[in-house]
């Protein structure tokens, strides 16, 4: 029998996208999953839409927060409820290809791995394909990941029996990158499924679309997560920016 995959989905005011996101999970060829949605006190119809799905599909589970506490809290809340052998992440506005989970679980088992991710394609806020494919080094070393988050959150899967549930402080930004750093520091290198298995949605109001916020949050990874002093963190950020501007674009291609 196939092992259970727990899909972690934090939500907040995503009524425009959540229906398609849930449907992309329901369309998976790998069917042994639970989708754990932790809502961070949405003020729109997000909760009502999720409840509509949950009433018809017992694999979809909703947990509601009474107050808005941030994406990190919602993600941790969902993770605490997870019961699967594997943990997968998906944001409430992104989409999976139908064979995403099946290909990744098979890849993990065939190669005796405990963590993997994949390439992904990009769409705009309205769902139009931007013909922009994001790839990564293969294999991906800890040093490469240290200077650039090559792992798309919507593509990552790890073995919770091996690593345990990786729960980080909710106040920390770039929580996803910190999780991958924690994992790859332990296993030394990571291997992606070398094909796109998801659509990443680029929204006008997303954190990922704000370069200034990203620089600030990425600096926090070196300063707070790794614990480096101010001067060394600045030097690391210079190397990080070099990687972002010069090296990473080589892995962004037309789809």
Predicted regions and their residues:
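Conserved donor NDP-sugar-binding/catalytic core segment of glycosyltransferases
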Residues: 99-130
């Amino acid at each position: 029998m196939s092992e259970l995959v727990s899909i972690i989905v934090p939500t907040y005011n995503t009524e425009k996208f959540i229906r398609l996101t849930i449907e992309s999970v329901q369309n998976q060829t790998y069917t042994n999953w639970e989708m754990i949605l932790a809502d961070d006190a949405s003020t729109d119809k997000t909760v009502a839409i999720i409840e509509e799905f949950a009433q018809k599909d017992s694999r979809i589970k909703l947990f509601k927060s009474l107050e808005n506490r941030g994406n990190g809290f919602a993600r941790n809340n969902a993770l605490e409820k997870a019961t699967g052998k594997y943990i997968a992440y998906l944001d409430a506005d992104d989409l999976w290809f139908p064979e995403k989970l099946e290909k990744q679980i098979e890849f993990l088992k065939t190669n005796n791995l405990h963590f993997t991710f994949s390439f992904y394609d990009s769409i705009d806020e309205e769902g139009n394909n931007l013909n922009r494919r994001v790839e990564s080094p293969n294999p991906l070393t800890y040093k490469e990941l240290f200077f650039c988050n090559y792992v798309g959150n919507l593509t990552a899967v790890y073995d919770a029996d091996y690593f345990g549930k990786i729960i980080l402080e909710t106040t920390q930004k770039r929580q996803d990158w910190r999780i991958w750093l924690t994992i790859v520091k332990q296993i030394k290198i990571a291997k992606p499924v070398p094909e796109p298995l998801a659509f990443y949605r680029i929204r006008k109001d997303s954190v990922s679309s704000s370069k200034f916020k990203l620089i600030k949050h990425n600096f926090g990874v070196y300063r707070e997560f790794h614990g480096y002093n101010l001067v060394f963190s600045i030097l690391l950020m210079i190397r990080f920016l070099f990687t972002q501007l010069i090296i990473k674009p080589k892995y962004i291609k037309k789809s």
